[in-house]
UniProtKB/Swiss-Prot annotation:
Keywords: Ribonucleoprotein, Ribosomal protein, RNA-binding, rRNA-binding. This is Large ribosomal subunit protein uL10. Belongs to the universal ribosomal protein uL10 family. It holds the Pfam family Ribosomal_L10. GO terms for biological process: translation. The lineage of its organism: Bacteria, Pseudomonadati, Pseudomonadota, Gammaproteobacteria, Enterobacterales. Forms part of the ribosomal stalk, playing a central role in the interaction of the ribosome with GTP-bound translation factors.
Length: 168
């Protein structure tokens, strides 16, 4: 579909707004993906508050100019699907990582890379971004560790009391 100059300008403005509000952006190559699979990916994205978009590379390059995501220019080759979230930096990476694992029948779907805090992350190192725990996950881990430490201290105190009573 041919876009007129006005629509292209609106898209560049929209991409620039995305680049200013997103915590991280993940870029993937959607070539060869069936429309049913893309629809499924969009449903999963809505559930995890991740936004998806397919944009032309020239418009993306113009939209990310003078933003922390400018280092994406080296990654933008061929068809481009971007995923981003303004709530959690790892949610888009986690979504695309899980989707690429489920697409074992389609080897064409590849995560090209990502940008987090102004630094480019290659597609092979996307796990470092995808494994960042959410606030709730981190809180759960902290509580579990705190409980284990408390239980361990209590156990040591009880053992020392038992030893003191046995020795006296």
């Amino acid at each position: 579909m041919m876009l007129d100059f006005k629509k292209k300008k609106e898209l560049v403005t929209q991409i620039n707004l995305i680049a200013k509000t997103a915590l991280s952006i993940v870029v993937a190559n959607p070539q060869g993906i069936k429309s049913n699979d893309i629809t499924q990916l969009r449903k999963l994205a809505r559930k995890s508050n991740v936004k998806l978009g397919v944009y032309r590379n020239t418009l993306l390059n113009l939209g990310i100019k003078n933003t922390p995501f400018e280092c994406l220019k080296n990654i933008l080759i061929g068809p481009t699907l971007i995923a981003y979230s303004s709530e959690h930096p790892g949610s888009a990476a986690k979504l695309l990582k899980n989707f690429s694992m489920s697409q074992s029948s389609n080897p064409n779907f590849k995560i090209l890379g990502a940008v987090f805090e102004g630094k480019a992350i290659s597609g092979s190192n996307i796990n470092s971004l995808a494994d960042i725990p959410t606030f709730n996950e981190a809180l759960r881990r902290f509580i579990i560790i705190a409980k284990e430490i408390s239980a361990g201290k209590l156990l040591r105190i009880l053992v020392s009391i038992k030893n003191i009573k046995e020795n006296s």
